[in-house]
């Protein structure tokens, strides 16, 4: 008996492409072509086409495609991540995962050029900016950048534009390796002289445009950046601090310490590891630098009736207006992940985030007190330990289900995250040959100024409240869950639900980027 094709398979193309054969023919007739192949032949030069035929593989249905993805996911061994290096274990609250990350009302909305159809996202992004501003102690924050390394690179560009006479930039040797690499390359690309230095030594010479300081360092160590900030200011330069937003719940803000710019990643505010991205970076600056800052900036205005309304501000910085003289490109953003991070802060509030930070720090302190060879006295969540053979320790812990960082042949880094437990500390201590002991706080520069004081961070802490808030915001937006958007194409609008559903599977979402 001849069977009809699987309905799921036969309809996959039609479900996700849109036009059917008759609609396609209407468009071809209007353009004067007999077929889609004829249109492509006319539009695409022959010399740039792929030679030969594509592999002849059978099409998969949605169900079959997900089953195939499941086989790929099952091949990943997900170790519990204690690796660090700018990527931290975090817990995404289910209400945020389901109603932001996996919700087409949020992930198919277009770049918010038009405030009339973007009020929900603009409010959520303003929450992100408020969060970053309060944590960093600097008055102006943007609505996200692409990642921590490129944010540091953007900070170098900002310092160079603001201090045109300075042609030297100093990079802290304690920056994460990937941040150091990207930042140095960006500096060289704009003809700056790059010096990678141990900032515990005194700065030598003049002609600086700025310095980039790690706070904390890649080994977790926390040092007071004020002497370096003061020294660069005395030489007419600017100070950028690369920091950790969760650490800033417990250590003093860069702005309070005198920094001009602060950058970092908001990943550990509820955004999964995702094997390295996408994650929303942030930048905050002093008021004097706001017109040089890259990235979207959400501001509060009034509508035609005089009511408060949100819109993108200072757009004369943007490439679509200023062209080659622009200091920003509006597409250099991670809006969905910034919304996720902001909602994580709203959901937990200052008290909840402080508890999370204190617990993580406490576990790190207990671990540090239980092993020999700890390299630094002050730290937040990461402990660097000197050992005889770092790779042997890493392998032993991998066999036990843990991923830790071989900083060098004789140093292992252990970075605690939100899901870490006392039982994890016990197993880690055992692998290092230590014995359990209680630690004491070792922050180095404890925070004395309040943070997250805006009422939005103290009003929405139950799942019902958050669910309703997210719905209220998405109802103020226009996305593909309501209608077609007659604008550009740089969104995830073509991603089928069956594809988006898989990105939060633990076997994909919880893999650290430096996992073997």
Question: Which residues make up each language-model segment?
Answer:
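N-terminal entrance/gating region of PLP-dependent enzymes' catalytic architecture
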Residues: 19, 42-127, 321, 444-516
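A glycine-rich phosphate-binding loop feature that marks nucleotide/adenosyl-phosphate handling sites
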Residues: 85-91, 146-150, 173, 200-201, ...
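Charged, compositionally biased N-terminal leader segments and the immediate start
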Residues: 1-19
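PLP-dependent aspartate aminotransferase-fold enzymes
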Residues: 90-106, 110-207, 493-516
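Conserved PLP-enzyme active-site core in the AAT-like
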Residues: 150-309, 370-371, 380, 384-387, ...
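Long, charged amphipathic helices and adjacent flexible linkers at domain junctions
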Residues: 201, 308, 436-455
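Active-site C-terminal subdomain of aminotransferase-like
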Residues: 269-370, 374-377
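Conserved C-terminal alpha-helix-loop-beta "cap" of PLP-dependent enzymes
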Residues: 351-429, 437-439, 473-475, 481, ...
């Amino acid at each position: 008996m001849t069977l009809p094709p699987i309905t799921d398979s036969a309809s996959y193309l039609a479900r996700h492409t849109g036009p059917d054969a008759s609609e396609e023919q209407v468009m071809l007739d209007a353009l004067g072509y007999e077929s889609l192949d004829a249109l492509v032949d006319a539009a695409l030069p022959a010399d740039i086409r792929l030679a030969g035929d594509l592999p002849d593989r059978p099409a998969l249905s949605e169900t079959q495609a997900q089953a195939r993805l499941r086989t790929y996911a099952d091949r990943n061994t997900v170790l519990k991540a204690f690796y660090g290096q700018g990527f931290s274990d975090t817990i995404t609250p289910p209400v945020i995962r389901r109603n932001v990350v996996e919700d087409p009302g949020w992930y198919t909305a277009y770049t918010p050029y038009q405030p009339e159809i973007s009020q929900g996202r603009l409010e959520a992004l303003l929450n992100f900016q408020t969060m970053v501003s309060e944590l960093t102690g600097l008055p102006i924050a943007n609505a996200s950048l692409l990642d921590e390394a490129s944010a540091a690179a953007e900070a170098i560009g900002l310092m160079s534009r603001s201090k045109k006479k300075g042609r030297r930039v100093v990079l802290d040797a304690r920056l994460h390796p990937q941040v150091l690499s990207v930042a140095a390359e960006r500096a060289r690309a704009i003809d700056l002289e790059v010096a990678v230095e141990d900032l515990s030594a005194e700065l030598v010479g003049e002609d600086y445009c700025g310095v980039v300081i790690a706070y904390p360092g890649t080994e977790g160590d926390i040092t007071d950046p004020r002497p370096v900030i003061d020294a660069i200011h005395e030489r007419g330069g600017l100070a950028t601090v690369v920091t950790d937003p969760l650490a800033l719940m417990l250590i003093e803000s860069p702005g309070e310490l005198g920094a001009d710019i602060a950058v970092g990643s908001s990943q550990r505010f509820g955004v999964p590891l995702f094997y390295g991205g996408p994650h929303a970076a942030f930048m905050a600056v002093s008021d004097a630098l706001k017109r040089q800052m890259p990235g979207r900036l959400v501001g509060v205005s009034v509508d035609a009736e005089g009511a408060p309304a949100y819109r993108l501000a200072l757009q004369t910085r943007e490439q679509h207006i200023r062209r080659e003289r622009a200091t920003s490109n509006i597409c250099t953003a991670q809006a969905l992940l910034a919304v996720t991070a902001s909602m994580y802060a709203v959901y937990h509030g200052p008290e909840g985030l402080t508890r999370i930070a204190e617990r993580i720090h406490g576990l790190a302190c207990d671990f540090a007190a239980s092993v020999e060879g700890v390299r630094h006295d002050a730290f937040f969540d990461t402990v660097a330990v000197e050992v005889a053979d770092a790779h042997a320790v890493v392998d032993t812990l991998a066999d036990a289900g843990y991923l830790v960082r071989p900083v060098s042949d004789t140093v292992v880094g252990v970075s605690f995250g939100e899901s870490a437990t006392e039982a994890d500390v016990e197993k880690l201590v055992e692998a290092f040959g230590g014995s359990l002991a209680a630690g004491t706080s070792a922050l180095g520069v404890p925070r004395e100024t309040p943070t997250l004081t805006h009422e939005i961070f103290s009003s929405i802490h139950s799942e019902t409240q958050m669910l309703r808030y997210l719905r209220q915001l998405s109802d103020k937006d226009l996305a593909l869950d309501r209608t077609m958007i007659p604008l550009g194409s740089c969104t995830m609008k073509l991603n089928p639900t069956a594809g988006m559903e898989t990105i939060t599977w633990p076997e994909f979402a919880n893999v650290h980027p430096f996992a073997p």
